[in-house]
Regions:
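Short, surface-exposed acidic/glycine-rich loop or hinge patches that mediate macromolecular interfaces
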Residues: 20-23, 84, 166, 190, ...
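ABC transporter nucleotide-binding domain
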Residues: 129-231
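C-terminal coupling/interaction segments
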Residues: 232-287
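ABC transporter nucleotide-binding domains
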Residues: 1-163, 167-168
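Short glycine-rich hinge loops at helix-strand junctions in the catalytic core
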Residues: 78, 204, 248
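Non-catalytic alpha-helical coupling and interface elements of nucleotide-dependent molecular machines
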Residues: 57-60, 180, 184, 205, ...
C-alpha cells in the first residue's frame, strides 16, 4: 500500500495511478489520492473541525471552498455531532471516520484504505462499511484487508496477492467459477433413487448427485441428503424442485452452496504455491 501511495519506492515493477507513474511523479499522484493507513496518526490535541481545516489547507483546497467541503464530509461521515470534540477523546470508530473524512476531503478520484475495519466492534464495522459503500460512484476505493468477509460484502472486484504476485482477480462470482469450476446444491429428497436421478437428468444431464454424510439404507419414502454438482453457473434450484415434484418425489429442502471468499483465497494461494514448487529446481543428489 505504501508503494501504491508513493511513500515507499518499489525495488522492481511499476505502478501507475490515474495514468501517472508513481515512481517518477509521486507528488502529482498524491494530489489524486486519499489515503487511510492502518494506523492513522491523528493529532490527539486537535478538534475534529480544526484538523480537517488544517488538512484541507495542506491539500491546497481554497479557503472559499474548504468550509462548505468540511460541512459536507462531516455529513457524509456522520461526524457533525463531534465536530468540536478533541480527537484524542473519541472512540476508535469515530477516529476511523475522521480518517475517512480527511481522505475524501479534497475529492480525490482514488481512495486507498488499509484495513479500514480492523479493531472495530460489530456496530462500528457496519457504520464504516455503509460509509465506504456510500462512496461508490463518487470515487474509486481500493481496500487492502485480511478480513475477507468484509471484502466480499464491500468490494465489486477482488485481487488476491501471494508473495507479491497477483494469483487471481475478478468479481467474487468470477473467482468462485475460476477456482472451483462448478456449482453445488444441498438437497433433501424422498423418492426412488433411480427416479430422482432421472428427474435431475432432465434439468442438466451433467448434474451429479452424491450422498451427504452417513446416509443409512432407506426406502423411497425416507428423506436422503444429497450434494448436487454441475458446471453450470446459472441458478437451477427452482428447476430441480419442479422436476422432482413432477416425478412424484418430495423435496424437504434445497440450498445452493456458495464457497466463501476465504475458501477462494485459500484455494488460490495454495494453487500458486503448488505452481512455484512444480517449477522450482530440484537439488542434485549427492554422490
Amino acid at each position: 500500500m505504501r508503494i501504491l501511495t508513493g511513500y515507499l519506492p518499489a525495488t522492481s515493477g511499476s505502478v501507475h495511478l490515474c495514468g501517472l507513474p508513481v515512481a517518477t511523479r509521486p507528488d502529482e499522484v498524491k494530489r489524486r489520492i486519499g489515503y487511510l493507513p492502518e494506523n492513522n496518526p491523528l493529532p490527539e490535541d486537535m478538534r475534529v473541525s480544526e484538523y480537517l481545516y488544517f488538512r484541507g489547507r495542506l491539500k491546497e483546497v481554497s479557503r472559499r471552498q474548504l468550509g462548505p467541503r468540511i460541512d459536507e464530509v462531516l455529513e457524509i461521515c456522520d461526524l457533525k455531532r463531534v465536530r468540536h470534540r478533541i480527537i484524542g477523546q473519541l472512540s476508535k470508530g469515530y477516529r476511523q471516520r475522521v480518517g475517512i473524512a480527511e481522505a475524501i476531503l479534497a475529492e480525490p478520484p482514488v481512495i486507498i484504505m488499509d484495513e479500514p475495519t480492523i479493531g472495530l466492534d460489530p456496530h462500528q464495522i457496519l457504520i464504516v462499511r455503509d460509509l465506504i459503500a456510500g462512496l461508490r460512484g463518487r470515487m474509486t476505493v481500493i481496500i487492502s484487508s485480511h478480513i475477507l468477509p468484509e471484502i466480499e460484502v464491500t468490494c465489486d472486484r477482488v485481487l488476491i496477492i501471494n508473495q507479491g504476485r497477483v494469483v487471481a482477480q475478478g468479481t467474487p462470482a468470477e473467482l468462485r467459477r475460476e477456482i472451483f469450476g462448478q456449482s453445488s446444491y444441498e438437497l433433501e429428497v424422498a423418492g426412488d433413487p433411480s427416479t430422482v436421478d432421472a428427474a435431475l437428468a432432465t434439468v442438466d444431464p451433467d448434474l451429479r448427485a452424491a450422498p451427504l454424510g452417513e446416509t443409512p439404507a432407506a426406502g423411497p419414502e425416507e428423506f436422503r441428503r444429497l450434494r448436487l454438482t454441475t458446471a453450470r453457473s446459472d441458478e437451477l434450484g427452482d428447476a430441480i424442485v419442479a422436476a422432482l415434484a413432477a416425478a412424484g418425489c418430495r423435496v424437504r429442502a434445497i440450498g445452493r452452496e456458495h464457497p466463501s471468499l476465504e475458501d477462494v483465497f485459500l484455494a488460490a494461494t495454495r494453487r500458486s504455491w503448488d505452481a512455484v514448487q512444480a517449477t522450482a529446481p530440484r537439488p542434485t543428489p549427492a554422490r
